[in-house]
Amino acid sequence: MGKRFLKKIIAQSPQDLKFISACCSEAKVKNSDIKYLPLNKIFLLSISRFNKESDNNERINSIIRFEFIQSSKSKNIDQNNFDLILELLAINLFKRKNNFEITLLFSKNKIITLNAEVIEVTLEDQKIINDKKF
């Protein structure tokens, strides 16, 4: 049995963010595990994702940390339903005049849009889950 390592991936360019998006597609996110800290300009997601980088297809608890976030908006997400499970499909990036718009696309047309000063996103694995259920 080989050693298993937890990863930390930092994105500072559009190409880097595409890699994080690919790693996190089909990740499960509980609505109560989404946090925006406006004073710190940080947006956090605690996700359960498949380890697509290995062949064993295990689940990993990870944190996606978006920094330098000026604002956050959501569409079609009930903020009062803390038990709602979202499935992250992709993370998209759009350049605006003086900033970036990061869009988190979830299944069933649910969207979170982040307005960022720069691209500074970290995907950090926390724990490998033995049980394949979310």
Residue ranges and their predicted role:
Residues 1-134:
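Surface-exposed, interaction-prone regions used to assemble/regulate multi-protein complexes
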